[in-house]
Amino acid sequence: MFACKNCGGNVKFDIKSGQLACEYCHSLFDPYAYEDKTSDAEVQKDFDATIFTCPQCGGEILSTDDTAAGFCSFCGASTVLYSRMQKEHKPAYIIPFAKTKDDCKQAYMSLMKKAIFAPKELKDPKFIDGFRGIYMPYWTYYVTQKAPISLPAKRSHRSGDYIITDHYRLEGDLDAYYKGLSYDASSSFDDNISEKLAPYDVKNMKRFTPAFLSGFYADTADLPSTIYASDAMDAACTNTVSEISKEPAFTGLSVDSDSAALSPLSLGTTVKETDYSMFPVWFLSYRNKDRVAYATVNGQTGKVVADLPISVGKFLLGSLIAAIPVYILLCLLTVLTPGMTLTIVGVLAIIANICYSQELTMIAVKEAGTEDKGRIAKEQPEALGAINNRRRLKAAKKATKTIKKKTNTSFIAYFILFIFVIQFVPALFAIIAGIGGSFGNADGSLILFVILTIISFIFSIRAFSSFDRMPGHKGVAGLIFGMVSMLIGDAVLLFQPVLDAWYYGAAFIIIASVLITLINVIRAFNVLTTRKLPQFATHKGGDDRA
């Protein structure tokens, strides 16, 4: 804790002034005025810090203050954190907070205005006031590239019935320097969040002194700098190829992403220096039973990255409202016979199953943590080689995309898509529903519906294989009900009852299964936008009173 030099009161870092401000007499002080003045020539490599530990998840956070922390930002637990004093490794640089808590809350609310299906709790002013300022640890890499290069490139064009591809060699002497390629140095900070929060402007880094932490908390590095060294070199290669492609003479050329010429070795890529730094993040956690969602704001730029779950009730209500005009258009385009109605709901069932199966596949990838290199480095270090290869291939493909002139067509594209959905999707349903009639008899409708049933079963079986990743294995009963409902539709078309009530009854059962599947899709989406409650042996959590 730092004391005011005038009145002895507590001083904290004031974001607006960039100085330490006294809470009582409002005096301002340079943060470097509180540095230890030692007679030793050697610069101190450690500083005194209070380590707070969450009793529920084992998360740890450090502070220069000794006031008891009462909230863990990483697991969302409202509890008094245990504390102890210890020496911490001193970072070389720090980017002080530039965005105040009010700036952070305004940026978050701007995002929430667009999130119409988000739970109301996420928009509660009391909840939003829970943002905490945390300095997250980063490794900052300084990368050089110096080598003669020869990149294979090609350009294709059509001539009559032929596609002609011209091959080129882009040759020259490369001399590039990248300053401040940064990656989070904490296994507790999800790589997906840190990558989306980027970039930070390293030009505004300042030499670290503990006084900058006054009034805030900080996570500490538990990953060695070697973990992300290959990523820094790959990022340098990606940017270099992108810059080369932007040269006017090379416009329209694409570089072979599988070429060995794009490797860090071929481009003479070397990490010359690495610094341990701290970057500012406003952090908020939302806990729902055994899952937690995070909202983060870049403390320098104000960029917001948030996990936004969906309220089941809001989404179903919105879907119902959106379905009404589509149903009206469908009725205007064709006469809905009982057989057509049954076929249409069968198509809807397939679409729902495809969405659900895809969500479960994505959950399997996320829960395995294979996209979070920091987590894998702590839990499965033997898998790092495969992850590095996958990330390198992804970076190479990103670098070799053909450079095209940017045009302001996004609004036009969305408008065209909207017109397509409104005008043609109902017609498409009508065409699909009428295919059975084109066979000339009821057997055609049965054949079509059997095909729909088989497709639905394929995606249902695929979904079954991923259920072990779903919390509580929820959704199994709904999936079975969906399969049974499709078989009921097959039975109705097979026996061809005289009463229309049989067809509409089967259609109603299938619609009910679609509704259940839709709810399961939302639940699966919420699993994707939340995370398992963290449990760490030595983990970093967070709390802040700024």
What residues fall within each predicted segment?
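Short Cys/His-rich micro-motifs in 6-15 aa windows
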Residues: H26-A33, C75-S83
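Extended, hydrophilic extramembrane loops/domains of integral membrane proteins
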Residues: F279-G313
